[in-house]
From Swiss-Prot:
Membrane topology designation: Single-pass membrane protein
Keywords: Membrane, Transmembrane, Transmembrane helix, Viral envelope protein, Virion
Recorded superkingdom: Viruses
Name this protein carries in UniProt: Major envelope protein
Subcellular location: Virion membrane
GO CC terms, sorted: host cell membrane; membrane; viral envelope; virion membrane
Task of the protein: Essential for membrane formation.
Main location, first listed in the record: virion
Membrane-traversing stretches: 53-70
Gene name, Swiss-Prot/TrEMBL: P9
Record organism: Pseudomonas phage phi6 (Bacteriophage phi-6)
Length: 90
């Protein structure tokens, strides 16, 4: 099996050891951290401040890239409109 089984206490939903958690679950924790989906159970999760910082930066970079793509697309159409008015550059 590529991922170890995750043993969880049904009463507290706390994991006994960080090493028992699957990689997929750890990735989901890092993705959920900046969204605030941990709430009161944050003390039971094995997500460090460094992982949260990496996740916040990742979300910021992704949002920036999406904004750049939208802006670039708009700028390209604007540039084409400007260049269309100059015959020797079109």
């Amino acid at each position: 099996m590529p991922f170890p089984l995750v043993k969880q206490d049904p009463t507290s939903k706390a994991f006994t050891e960080a090493s028992e958690r699957s990689t997929g679950t750890q990735i989901l924790d890092v993705v959920k951290a900046p969204i605030g989906l941990f709430g009161d159970d944050a003390k039971h999760e094995f997500v460090t401040r460094q992982e949260q910082a990496v996740s916040v930066v990742s979300w910021a970079v992704a949002a920036g890239l999406i904004g750049e793509l939208i802006g670039y697309r708009g700028a390209r159409s604007g540039r084409k409109a400007i260049l269309a008015n100059i015959p020797f550059l079109a």
